[in-house]
């Protein structure tokens, strides 16, 4: 199925539904939720998925797992998606929180095949086997640390959201502590309690995740490093590898599979 609303088919009696959708540039899907679990795969472009818990960046050729009944907003940058909508009973192992994952070559091929299946595919035969393989393959995907958790504390959340709009790797914790009228030590405890991360680690991940949103536009590493406040491109690349375990080139056109169809 391609370019049809999931609401038109969501109640079909099939464990998995696959839909391919093309979106205009800078398209935003306002907050919504699905009865089914969703696997949202970026065939092209980059997505940013937001929930009350945080924000997840999804580079090209990766996917985000979205639990059922999870309100979320999606910002699209040059995106064509391949989505799976899965009955919760068919995937009891599905994570309770959004998760960005690497997509194996096998799952990618299965996704491309599934979107061209009939909505009410036969429950026995080739298409049912494709669905069964998809469910098996989904269980073993490698998570990527591309989430930026957001605190529930209103004051700290406002500061975090402002930082995400204009991240700076050298933004000092003292500025945040002053804004909240607390000591830096108290800020550190609050940050860890609210996000599960230290201030320094959260700041670095936020910067690296932000850089991924710029890569599809061809922004060079030198400019990304300067914009984020890194001393030089080498420092940015080292930080990138520390967070994601691979260099920026792994997330650019040269490091991705060919275009999906």
Each model region followed by its residue ranges:
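Generic protein-terminus/edge-of-domain signal
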Residues: 1-46
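Short acidic-glycine-tyrosine-enriched beta hairpin
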Residues: 53-68
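Short hydrophobic/aromatic patch on the recognition helix
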Residues: 61, 187, 191, 235-236, ...
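Ligand-binding loop in jelly-roll beta-barrel domains
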Residues: 69-98
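A short, Lys/Arg-enriched amphipathic alpha-helix from helix-turn-helix/homeodomain DNA-binding modules
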Residues: 130-131, 143-173, 177-180, 197, ...
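Terminal helix-turn-helix DNA-binding modules in bacterial transcription factors
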Residues: 174, 193-233, 237, 253-261
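Alpha-helical residues within the helix-turn-helix
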Residues: 178, 189, 193, 226-227, ...
């Amino acid at each position: 199925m391609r370019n049809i609303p999931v609401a038109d088919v969501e109640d079909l009696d099939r464990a998995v539904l696959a839909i391919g959708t093309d979106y205009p540039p800078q398209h935003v899907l306002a907050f919504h939720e699905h009865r089914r679990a969703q696997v949202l795969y970026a065939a092209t472009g980059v997505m940013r998925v937001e929930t009350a818990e945080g924000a997840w960046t999804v580079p090209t050729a990766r996917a985000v797992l979205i639990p059922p009944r999870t309100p979320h907003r999606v910002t699209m940058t040059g995106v064509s998606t391949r989505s799976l909508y899965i009955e919760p009973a068919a995937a009891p192992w599905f994570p309770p929180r959004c998760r960005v994952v690497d997509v194996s070559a096998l799952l990618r091929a299965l996704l491309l095949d599934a979107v061209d299946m009939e909505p009410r595919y036969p429950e026995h035969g080739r298409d049912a086997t494709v669905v069964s393989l998809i469910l098996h393959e989904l269980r073993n995907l490698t998570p990527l640390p591309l989430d930026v958790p957001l605190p529930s504390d209103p004051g700290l959340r406002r500061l975090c959201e402002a930082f995400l709009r204009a991240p700076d790797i050298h933004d000092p914790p003292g500025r945040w502590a002053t804004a909240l009228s607390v000591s830096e030590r108290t800020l550190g405890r609050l940050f860890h309690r609210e996000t599960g991360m230290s201030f320094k680690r959260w700041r670095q991940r936020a910067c690296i995740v932000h850089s991924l949103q710029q890569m599809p536009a061809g922004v060079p590493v030198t400019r990304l490093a300067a914009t984020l406040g890194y001393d030089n491109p080498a420092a940015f690349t080292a930080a990138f590898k520390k967070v994601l375990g691979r260099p920026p080139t792994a997330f650019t056109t040269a490091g991705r599979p060919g275009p999906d169809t």
